[in-house]
């Protein structure tokens, strides 16, 4: 049975992803992790939860080992509005989360899913019916 860790589970996508994956893999096989105490408390009503700062690779790895994780869903991201105001912080969080997820997925032979952030296309990219070969020029 797959054991899935969703990091950033308290975000917009994570809050929908947790119950969806629970339906397919069972309640006890989906672990929801988030940095924010309020989201961890809220999610603990409906899921197995862990508080996690994904930039702390040792804490991240401890959870992967504790639950014998087969798949990691990295939903952690600092979104465009904040990222454009503080690009260094966006880089630290978004790339740090990705790098730690890649490192642990490789070391523990887990599957990894990590989506592209919302601002990946940039301001000058067509917003409707965006062609597959569009040049991406993000602002962040």
Which positions does each model-derived feature cover?
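N-terminal Rossmann NAD(P)H-binding glycine-rich loop of SDR-like oxidoreductase domains
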Residues: 4-24
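SDR active-site strand-loop-helix element
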Residues: 7, 33, 72-76, 112-118
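Conserved glycine-rich Rossmann-like NAD(P)H-binding loop of the short-chain dehydrogenase/reductase
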Residues: 25-37
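Rossmann-fold cofactor-recognition segment
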Residues: 44-56
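A hydrophobic alpha-helix adjacent to the NAD(P)-binding/active-site core of NAD(P)-dependent oxidoreductases
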Residues: 49, 90-91, 138
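NAD(P)-cofactor binding segment of oxidoreductase domains
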Residues: 72, 85-112
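Conserved Rossmann-fold NAD(P)-dependent oxidoreductase catalytic core, especially the SDR/UDP-sugar
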Residues: 99-137
